[in-house]
Amino acid sequence: MAVWQAASGKVYLPPSTPVARVQSTDEYVQRTNIYYHAYSDRLLTVGHPYFNIYDIQGTKIKVPKVSGNQHRVFRLKLPDPNRFALADMSVYNPDKERLVWGCRGIEIGRGQPLGVGSVGHPLFNKLGDTENPNSYKGNSTDDRQNVSFDPKQLQMFIIGCAPCLGEHWDRALPCADDVPNPGSCPPIELKNTAIQDGDMADIGYGNLNFKALQENRADVSLDIVNETCKYPDFLKMQNDVYGDSCFFYARREQCYARHFFVRGGKTGDDIPAGQIDEGSMKNAFYIPPVNNQAQNNLGNSMYFPTVSGSLVSSDAQLFNRPFWLQRAQGHNNGICWFNQLFVTVVDNTRNTNFSISVHSENTDVSKIQNYDSQKFQEYLRHVEEYEISLILQLCKVPLTAEVLAQINAMNSNILEEWQLGFVPAPDNPIHDTYRYINSAATRCPDKNPPKEREDPYKDLNFWNVDLSERLSLELDQYSLGRKFLFQAGLQQATVNGTKTVSSKLSTRGVKRKRKQ
């Protein structure tokens, strides 16, 4: 960025050398009047709401973890528009242009009824209630209780052509000359990582690596006690120079403190009031009680609330409604580079957990004589239901020197995917072909086959949704397509066999003046 800096502390001077300016995609991408509708199947997933269930060996997952407090990250794979056999070949010149997709609208459909979920821990670190205490309670060896609560209410989705960037606090390495004492609090740092499918969202206890920073395994609920809660780094994505991770987003969060508790255990940071003799902090925070009082055994000061998401209502839903993209927050105005789109979703307003009970002896219900709770196996399951619809606009990128330089500086892999300047070598008229190439009598096959371009996100976990054969030009045949045509005042027409969209023009006549 070109910024002015103070030379001697008094005068601000302009940048000494010109700095390359990042262009918006609107400056070099040409949009056509051809629109496609893309839609997914009904996307379903079922699992346990708190943890993975493994087999006896503990190596294979029998039932995956599926929680309403997880991020769902859909990686939508779109077809390559440059391979489309367009009926109207005047749309673009393949020798001078390349086709890309532009996202103009999206609707994230959610099934299942609204419901409030409950999370908790059978051994939760809760010493006592500090909102309305009736006696002074001190610490013991184990004060854990069976506590449950409803999480913070969260609805959010983020649209981009790159994975959403998340942030969380994690354990940091201490300085080399600073040897920490046993039991001392470790330093922490803010880390940025991509949000993957299945990563836990913040449910009211912050974006923290609980697995590394809460060794008692009792300070939070079961669904996050061994996890890392992430939160989208909106500040960093909004200031991204290209804006690929977040075209736009919608967010709705709400919570309130329902109960106020205090932690059990030994306080690591003592209240500064215990100096010997007449220290500078003596009686600064509290005055010591007499020896025969229960208050003489000072209680903990590790206070915390249990949050609640409160009312769940259909009046404040972000889903099952269309969103239109006119202007993105960054320089990328909805262009889907590499023919893919990332949709990051969190919605815990449909957070009902199913309780399933099975008789341990598989006895018919009509033959059970007396109720015995120990003869029933109780199970928990959570289900998620999604459906995604898109409005895609066909766009052209001119292959000029200025545009190619801009794209190469942004991501050179885009040009490699377009195969610019690729001229195949002349074919040798005679090749050697072995019949039994894998036998011991012939030479080994080629050990260095041509490498395909590696997926930069191969190590990340996403819900892959293939839309390569789910596109249609018949916008008026789909719900989102009809909404798009109506809200924009457009109508469809067929030009040279290709469906195009044009504006509706008013043909209202001019009112004649009345003769005097």
UniProtKB/Swiss-Prot annotation:
Cellular component aspect of the GO annotation: host cell nucleus; T=7 icosahedral viral capsid
Single Gene Ontology BP annotation: virion attachment to host cell
Keywords: Capsid protein, Disulfide bond, Host nucleus, Host-virus interaction, Late protein, T=7 icosahedral capsid protein, Viral attachment to host cell, Viral penetration into host cytoplasm, Virion, Virus endocytosis by host, Virus entry into host cell
Compartments where found: Virion; Host nucleus
InterPro entries on file: Capsid_L1_Papillomavir (IPR002210), Capsid_L1_sf_Papillomavir (IPR036973), dsDNA_vir_gr_I_capsid (IPR011222)
Main location: virion
Pfam families per UniProt: Late_protein_L1 (PF00500)
One Gene Ontology MF term: structural molecule activity
UniProt superkingdom: Viruses
rRNA processing among keywords: no
Function description: Forms an icosahedral capsid with a T=7 symmetry and a 50 nm diameter. The capsid is composed of 72 pentamers linked to each other by disulfide bonds and associated with L2 proteins. Binds to heparan sulfate proteoglycans on cell surface of basal layer keratinocytes to provide initial virion attachment. This binding mediates a conformational change in the virus capsid that facilitates efficient infection. The virion enters the host cell via endocytosis. During virus trafficking, L1 protein dissociates from the viral DNA and the genomic DNA is released to the host nucleus.
Family assignment from sequence similarity: Belongs to the papillomaviridae L1 protein family.
Subunit field text: Self-assembles into homopentamers. The capsid has an icosahedral symmetry and consists of 72 capsomers, with each capsomer being a pentamer of L1. Interacts with the minor capsid protein L2; this interaction is necessary for viral genome encapsidation. Interacts with protein E2; this interaction enhances E2-dependent replication and transcription activation.
Protein name per its UniProtKB record: Major capsid protein L1
Organism of this sequence: Human papillomavirus 20
